[in-house]
Amino acid sequence: ASCLVGSEMCIRDRVELRQRPWNRNYVGTHFGGSLFAMTDPFWMLLVMQNLGRDYYVWDKAGSIDFIKPGRGTVTADFVLDNAILDTLRSATESGEKYLHWFDTDVHDLSGDVVARVRKQLYIKRKPQR
């Protein structure tokens, strides 16, 4: 979906994970692997779709920090604006690789942060043919 950040257009995706018996851990909260997995592909997909076919985009690294137990439905928002895309384009215009970290908070229905996820992407402009 499109959105505005200040006066800039941006792209926004929201992911939702409902708690079920198969994603619940031994103590009855969301399994940490499910919280990480719900966020896994989205930064790479958003960047690939918006930079276009002239770029290599790969997941490089990731981490998760568990803030509080996640219960019920949890959500994560991904907002990619033109300023980030401009940074990625300018950092790779000479053909060098660029590593960029993206941060995403996972919230419960009360709006409390239950986890902070970081994903690092490898981005490189493809050679001209």
Mark where each language-model region is.
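Hydrophobic residues positioned within well-ordered beta-strands of beta-sheet architectures
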Residues: 15, 60-62, 76, 100-102, ...
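Hot-dog-fold acyl-thioester-processing enzymes
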Residues: 23-42, 56
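Hydrophobic beta-strand-centered segment that forms part of the acyl-chain substrate-binding groove
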Residues: 46-83
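A short local loop/turn or secondary-structure capping micro-motif enriched for an aromatic residue
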Residues: 22-25, 123-125
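Single conserved hydrophobic/aromatic residue that forms the stacking wall/gate
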Residues: 1-6, 10-11
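Short N-terminal helix-initiation segments at or just after the protein's N-terminus
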Residues: 7-8, 22-23, 41-54
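Short, aliphatic-rich beta-strand segments
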Residues: 12-19
